[in-house]
Amino acid sequence: MKTLSVLPLLCFQFSPRNVESSIKYFLVQSFRAAIILKLALMQAWLYSSWSVVKTPKFFISSGLIMALGLKMGLFPCHYWFPDVVQGAGFLQGLLLSTWQKVAPLVVLGYVCKCDKSRILLIMGALSVLVGGWGGLNQTQTRKILAFSSIAHIGWICVLISYSFRVRVIMFLVYTIINSRVFLLRKEFGLTSLSMFGRLLNYNPVRGVIVVLGVLSLGGLPPLFGFLIKFLALECLVYEGAFFLRFILVLGSLIRLFFYLRVGFKRRLVYFPQHSIRMFVWRRKILNTRVRYLYVLVLRVLSGLNLLGILSSPLLVSFLKK
């Protein structure tokens, strides 16, 4: 039902790229649903149980984790996700990167409730690395955000086996930061990296706001994105997962590198142009109330994003309860 409800939103503009993105998403999700249904029937036939809390056989739980990883775009089933996000609009990409991942994460939490799943840990850790390496050679902002989504969901999947509170807070923080970045890029039409340099020349204040959102998504201290990664690493150290922590830090540093490139390199090497040619001058005029609501949402998200280290006592006290 979620897949069928998202398909009209993906092809809302009815362009060739939107239709292609919708078809890819439908085929992938149909294949995933068929796998889950097959595994459920096998478990009901062999063990007379429909529960996913504790599956009796390894191959059933492993197949279920792989199918849910396919839905979220985890490694090694991540190839479809960047193309679908690139073909969709910014709002549709935001929907695929946040809301569509809630149900699979909840089911994974039930599957791994009793014991730690090594397959999920491996998929999550490798997703962080793939999310970092995949974004290095990209110039389209939606593909960069797609690989960033793969990496962040990898972090959350690793934390599923360790801490419920940390993974919930991390997903909420990721949703806030990602929503802000997607909405700002939609507002200013930032479809490629070259547009960042133009925005900084055209309106430095807005350009700095966008760059801060991007750097927060990459985890640069003392912004909000760094705080939640620090708490996640503290949780992994407490559990003794030192090698896993090393992999996550390595993937995050790689991802932070291309976010720094987005924020600074285009500013330094972009050839100066007149601001009259920076952006398309014909833009849609929104309704006054819709416009005010849109600006209010962006300001709230920007304020939450810039809290950073100031909100650390509140989060630490919540986690220690």
Where does each model-flagged region fall?
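Alpha-helical transmembrane segments of multi-pass membrane proteins predominantly involved
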Residues: M1-K321
